[in-house]
Design a protein with these regions (language model features):
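Transmembrane signal-anchor hairpin modules in multi-pass inner-membrane enzymes, especially those
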Residues: 1-85, 109-119, 173-185
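Residue-level micro-sites within transmembrane alpha helices that shape
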Residues: 9, 24, 31, 75, ...
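Structural signal for membrane-spanning alpha-helices in multi-pass inner-membrane proteins
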Residues: 21, 42-46, 77, 104-105, ...
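Membrane-embedded alpha-helical segments of multi-pass membrane proteins
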Residues: 29-48, 91-102, 158-167, 208-215
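Aromatic-anchored transmembrane helix interface
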Residues: 62-70, 84-107, 115-125, 129, ...
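Alpha-helical transmembrane segments of multi-pass inner-membrane proteins
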Residues: 74, 113-143, 153-218
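Membrane-interface helix termini and inter-helical loops of multi-pass transporters
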Residues: 81-87, 140-150
């Protein structure tokens, strides 16, 4: 068991993270199940490789910066009419959901596997955004203001958040020749899909944020 985990953990984590990217928006239950498997695999690998794990100082400083940000955000969760609910959302968004970074930083060392995860993310975002545009054109299952959320029943705000996150990343990957050709092509496809997706999503915030980022990056 130990030798199998040490030998295959990198590939298993790569596959699980890719599957999670492709399933969470359409099925939260399945996405959370896969996410739990990622955390479990990470914990098992940490135990078996506990004497080998080392975190570079360059990464540690970002970790401490993130902890500082959490301490700054935490009071906003505590100053609420329903502290139980806001605290739950705080830990879900800023702690639980961020744990996926750990296996990527600690155990996925192959650049090919990292590029594969990035390509999967770009392709998925392109398809997700195109589905929102199709929903908008067909008038299917639209939210308030005629806005589309993508993936049939996707969240409008969730899509807007992902568009704001993914658009500048895809723009950088498309322009940076250091990335492999297939990553840059997936980024270009993602950019095309996300432009149409922003049209379907009708989020003024995503248009404004991505417009500013587009000018700054290019």
């Amino acid at each position: 068991m130990q030798s199998w985990v040490i030998k295959n953990s990198e590939m298993v984590l790569t596959v699980l993270i890719s599957l999670m990217i492709c399933t969470t928006r359409s099925s939260m239950a399945l996405g959370n199940l896969i996410y739990s498997l990622i955390i479990l695999m990470t914990l098992v690998t940490c135990w078996y490789r506990r004497h080998e794990i080392s975190v570079p100082q360059s990464i540690r400083q970002y970790g401490w910066a993130y902890v500082g940000m959490l301490l700054c955000v935490l009071p906003s969760a505590l100053i609420s009419n329903d502290i139980a609910v806001t605290t739950k959302y705080f830990f879900n968004i800023w702690v639980w959901k961020v744990l996926v970074i750990l296996p990527i930083l600690l155990f996925i060392k192959s650049s090919r596997k990292l590029y594969a995860i990035l390509s999967v993310f770009f392709v998925y975002m392109g398809i997700d955004a195109l589905s929102a545009f199709a929903q908008y054109l067909l008038g299917y299952n639209l939210g308030p203001g005629g806005r589309a959320g993508g993936v049939i029943n996707g969240s409008m705000m969730g899509l807007a958040m992902l568009l704001i996150l993914a658009f500048p990343l895809a723009l950088i990957a498309a322009y940076d020749k250091a990335f492999p050709s297939y990553v840059r092509k997936s980024a270009v496809f993602s950019l095309f899909g996300m432009l149409l997706g922003m049209w379907g999503n009708q989020s003024r915030g995503s248009w404004l944020f991505n417009g500013i980022n587009g000018v700054l990056i290019t």
